């Protein structure tokens, strides 16, 4: 039996940008309105089913507070993916993505997939960072980019599918057209629900 490929994904970004909420939405399809800061590092894993293989995603949720920054390089060091999150309603959190990206580059060079994520699109009326600014930052650093809403569930599964398609050893041709393009195709309706329902393909069992 072929062994299950495992990939480490580390979530980085300032405090309260929604790193934990993105992971919780992906893992359990829930959103906790009560904010609790991550203390140190949390770890969860989930199995993801692609068309031609199954992978185990190991999700490392890091604290955004400055007092925990000394811990983070050691977790970046052996990661396959770095997901750098900012809050679209907080310009400072966007500006600070530069230092998070540089931390990743310093530890991993170019041997890592980096995804820049603008979270909290459900608060579009309070937006301080435009989509164009996010796209420009991603282009500048030659990394991937998307926007999400952990609260509304917008683009969460699409985010992980996009990351999965870029993992080392994954043939991007095995991802369907919809899996490749769903990030730009889905949208938020007036009711705050995704206009396009994303497909499943994830193990929801606690044993995954």
From Swiss-Prot:
**Record: residues binding GTP:** 14-21, 38, 62-66, 120-123
Lipidated sites in chain (S-geranylgeranyl cysteine): 208
Q: In the UniProt record, which is one GO cellular component term?
A: lipid droplet
Q: Which residues form the signal peptide?
A: none
Single GO molecular function: GTP binding
Identify the keywords attached in UniProt to this record, alphabetized: GTP-binding, Lipoprotein, Nucleotide-binding, Prenylation, Protein transport, Transport
GO terms of biological process kind = intra-Golgi vesicle-mediated transport; intracellular protein transport; retrograde transport, endosome to Golgi; retrograde vesicle-mediated transport, Golgi to endoplasmic reticulum
User: Highest taxon of the source?
Assistant: Eukaryota
- Quote the SMART domains the UniProt record gives: RAB (SM00175), RAN (SM00176), RAS (SM00173), RHO (SM00174)
InterPro entries (UniProt xref): P-loop_NTPase, Rab, Small_GTP-bd, Small_GTPase
Family named by the database record: Belongs to the small GTPase superfamily. Rab family.
What PANTHER family would the database entry show?
A: RAS-RELATED PROTEIN RAB
Tell me, in a sentence or two, what this protein's role is: Protein transport. Probably involved in vesicular traffic.
Per its record, how is this protein called by name? Ras-related protein Rab-6
Whose protein is this, by species? Dictyostelium discoideum
Gene coding for it: rab6
